[in-house]
């Protein structure tokens, strides 16, 4: 009698699994719990309520952004195309650091000097054909003295030639959404069609600061030497000695561009980027950057984002060999940009399903975290799966069923 009941139980369970799998296959996505946020969703830019004043800026174009969120805090003619002089070297530096991150170069890699690099005009360290420096030394020359010959030598190392490297520069600019930028060379000398905007410069600057923070090791150097002390390097960014919290980033001056700067600064966890293009003099360039940064630090603050203490660390998964999937809250920023006078408390509200349906892939968005200041929504960020949970195959299900039945019979 017991053997008959066991056989009937087995037959019933097998039929159930066959029906469930067949139904799931026929219905496809209809059986699966849909994520609250679509997969790979981008964090929303924070909503800010501060009305910026009319600043007096002695330049053709300017923009001030929060480095962490990308929020625009002030802008003036930010989409007007114009030459950007040696600020071009920010893209040269970005591609170089990315080559280092990819393992193609190290800071000890020897950088040869070609005839082409030797003939660069403008600011330089007077490289000689056949002379070699390490990449570390060349980066100092670019970041501190804005050396055009060093920038071209590095571009040739990374891209094979300057024209090939310029193609990489334009491709990377397109990837970053720099819609009004076209590069014609790696150093920023005035060339027809070599144009950008204050907004695009801010995008480029934010990218290198967020993804290659080691650039600040070089942009923060005030003085250094090369050739065993024979060549003196003095930083062209005088704000390093004049402005509290300045960290970089790059100056630029040509006849076509005027006097320019993209300046990065940090105070009390608030990281700002001020871009000034087309100032009539170096003095007015630094004055404009100072005005922008002073406004930003006075009008805004960086508030720590509190993660809910009782947040779920994992979610249950149906139809998988994995019972649960761990959750990744890394998209939530550590700090949030708030108006300085804001008295509201930051909170995080989570929207997550009770369970997930397999398959689940690592990095898939499974919910969202809403950042609030009082009742005002400051931003929304994806909550992602931190591991895979593959869909259980029919054979695996039968094996698990058989093992469980054998255990029950024993």
Task: Report residues per predicted region.
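Sec-dependent N-terminal signal peptides of Gram-positive bacterial secreted proteins and lipoproteins
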Residues: 4-27
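Generic alpha-helix initiation/capping and coil-helix boundary signal
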Residues: 13-15, 166, 282
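Active-site-adjacent loops and short helices of periplasmic peptidoglycan-processing enzymes
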Residues: 2-5, 26-212
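Domain-terminus/edge residues, biased toward the C-terminal soluble/receptor-binding domains
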Residues: 178-182, 190-195, 199-410
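Short, compositionally biased leader-like segments
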Residues: 20-41, 329-344
